[in-house]
């Protein structure tokens, strides 16, 4: 008896993009800023640390109810807002039939904190004023009830469902940069296999938080004492946190065509790895192995990376990039900062946007690693190497 033949994988298109970043709101604002080589950094508020602050928006345009806005913390508002932009871009905003079957596969961090309560508890403990019931009393009476909602990672998806009506299946991944790689990988695999027709993928990050800066300072990851582009940080390694929301709508070619949707690009493949970074060169080897699995072909290619500027991962990624010098490189960390879970979907968004414009945005790098690309890119590889663990790669291609 012959084995049944497996169905061919379905083609998957990117049909919607939502961006709200330190460079602005929407695709036009971000594209214009990239082409103007504009960078928005704040070197004073959190000095000596540096952040890429979120560009203020009118939340009412995507989150109509003030009550919904109040029960979210900043990272959830950023994400819910950017998700709405992606749905608008895809032409499905308010379409209950499509939204009712739209799946969500997103990445999220662990929520935000009330710094005033944290500081009061720590100060009391330092002065010896914390009796056995003090901590519970402060947590019960000092925290507003809605803060507990902001602590739940899966409530980013919950808020998107409530505000925008996206009510298919929902999956939330945690794990910094690697989480968003897996979110994209699994969403793509499900659509390609016929288990899903359309999905919303992405993440959001609020980098303007003292508690996060403190945590990354413990690891020696923060860029301090002046901004320089990612590739020029050898003598002062580290990353500048950035605030951003990046979401995409991806769907099968057949589903998109049936509703008359115009694609930005094709999402061809997403692959992931978790290198054991105990030996020098582990990241270089991991990225090369992913490249070989990706299906990159000869032609006009570019490479958009979420390189952080932290070491030793950035130097090891550079070694990989030098092996593929025929691909024009762009580092999102220079323009947008390190946006953790949002870094990989940001790269996907910029890749699709570049392909749809028929041009790669210009380099913003004094070292010469990034070079001009005169021809329209037909394929863009998106690279995500986490600042301390996790590697991922995606292939975004033009649709002929």
Summary of predicted features, one role per range:
Residues 186:
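Internal active-site segments that recognize and position negatively charged phosphoryl groups
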Residues 1-169, 173-174, 181, 189-193, ...:
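Conserved "HGTGT" condensation-loop signature of ketosynthase/thiolase-family condensing enzymes
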């Amino acid at each position: 008896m012959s084995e049944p033949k497996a169905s061919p994988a379905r083609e998957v298109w990117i049909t919607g993009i939502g961006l709200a970043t330190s460079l602005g709101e929407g695709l036009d604002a971000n594209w214009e800023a990239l082409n103007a080589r504009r960078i928005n950094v704040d070197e004073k508020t959190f000095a000596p640390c540096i952040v890429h602050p979120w560009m203020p928006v009118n939340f009412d345009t995507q989150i109509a109810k003030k009550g919904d806005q109040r029960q979210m913390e900043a990272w959830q508002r950023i994400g819910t807002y950017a998700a709405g932009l992606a749905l608008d871009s895809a032409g499905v905003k308010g379409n209950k039939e499509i939204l009712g079957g739209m799946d969500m596969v997103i990445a999220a961090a662990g929520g935000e904190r009330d710094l005033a309560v944290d500081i009061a508890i720590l100060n009391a403990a330092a002065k010896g004023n914390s009796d056995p019931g003090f901590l519970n009393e402060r947590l019960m009476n000092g925290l507003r009830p809605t803060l507990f909602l902001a602590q739940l990672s899966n409530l980013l998806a919950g808020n998107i469902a409530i505000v925008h009506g996206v009510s298919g299946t929902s999956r939330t991944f945690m794990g910094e940069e690697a989480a968003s790689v897996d979110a994209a990988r699994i969403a793509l695999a499900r659509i390609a296999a016929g288990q899903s027709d359309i999905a919303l993928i992405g993440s959001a990050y609020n980098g303007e938080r003292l508690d996060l800066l403190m945590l990354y300072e413990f690891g020696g990851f923060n860029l301090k004492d002046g901004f320089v582009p990612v590739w020029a940080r050898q003598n002062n390694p580290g990353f500048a946190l950035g605030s951003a929301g990046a979401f995409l709508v991806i769907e099968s070619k057949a589903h998109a065509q049936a509703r008359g949707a115009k694609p930005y690009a094709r999402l061809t493949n997403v692959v992931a790895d978790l290198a054991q970074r105990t030996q020098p060169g582990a990241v270089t080897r991991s990225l090369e192995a992913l490249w070989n699995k990706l299906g990159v072909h000869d032609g006009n290619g570019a490479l958009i990376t979420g390189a952080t500027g932290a070491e030793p991962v950035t130097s090891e990624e550079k070694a990989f990039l030098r092996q593929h010098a025929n691909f024009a490189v762009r580092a999102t960390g220079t323009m947008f900062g390190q946006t953790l879970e949002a870094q990989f979907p940001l790269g996907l968004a910029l890749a699709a946007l570049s392909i749809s414009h028929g041009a790669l945005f210009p380099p913003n790098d004094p070292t010469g690693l990034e070079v001009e690309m005169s021809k329209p890119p037909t394929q863009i590889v998106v690279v995500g190497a986490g600042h301390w663990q996790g590697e991922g790669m995606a292939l975004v291609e033009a649709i002929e």
